Amino acid sequence: MNSKKRLSLLMIGATVTSLMGGTVSTYAADNTETTEPLTIAEQGIFSAGGITITSDGTFNPEDQWEETGAGQTSHVDYANVLYQIPEEETSLPMVFLHGYGQSRMGWMTTPDGREGWAEMFLRDGHSVYLVDEPRRGEAGQTSVSGTISTKTLDQRWYTQFRIGRWEDGKSVPNEGSQFPNDDNSVDQFFRQMTPDTGMT
C-alpha cells in the first residue's frame, strides 16, 4: 500500500474514531469503576466449526465483480470466539454463550459502562472464552438465506429478559433488580441487540 493511500485510510479512521468517541466517551468515563489494571497474558480470536460451501461453475479472476459466485467458496455457519487468559490463571476456564438477540458484547460490559462478567472472571483468575454463535455477531456468514427483521422490538427485549416492565413509555425494573435504569443505560442496553443473519 502506498503512503498516500495509507495516510488517507488513517485520516478516515481518525475522523470516524473522533466522531464515535465524542458520543460515548464522557458517558463511559463517568461510569467506569476505578480498579487495578487487568493484566492479560494472552488473548486472541479464532473460529470453530461451520462448513465450506462451493457454487457451481468456474471462478473467473478477470471479473472480480461478477455477482453469481460461480466456482467460489464460502466459509459459513461457524462460531467466533474471543479468548483472554489472565497472567495468573488460578481457576477453571469460563465459556460464555449469549442468548437470543444478543452477541458476546453482553458479557464484555454493562449498559452503564462498568466491567462486564468476562472481566470480573478474568480478575478472579479464570480464562474466558466469549462465543458469538453461528449466524450472529462476528460469526455472521450463513449458508441459509433469510430476511433480517426490521421490526421495532426494544420493549419486548426488556420484558423477555425479565429486567422489568415497560409502562407508559418508561422502563420499570422488577423489584430488587440491579439494572441501571437511567435513560443512557437503557439506550445502551437496546444497542446490544443484534439480528440473526440466517434462519435457524
Role assignments for model-derived ranges:
Residues D30-E89:
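N-terminal cap/lid segment of alpha/beta-hydrolase-fold proteins
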Residues H98-T110:
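Active-site glycine-rich loops that stabilize anionic/oxyanionic intermediates
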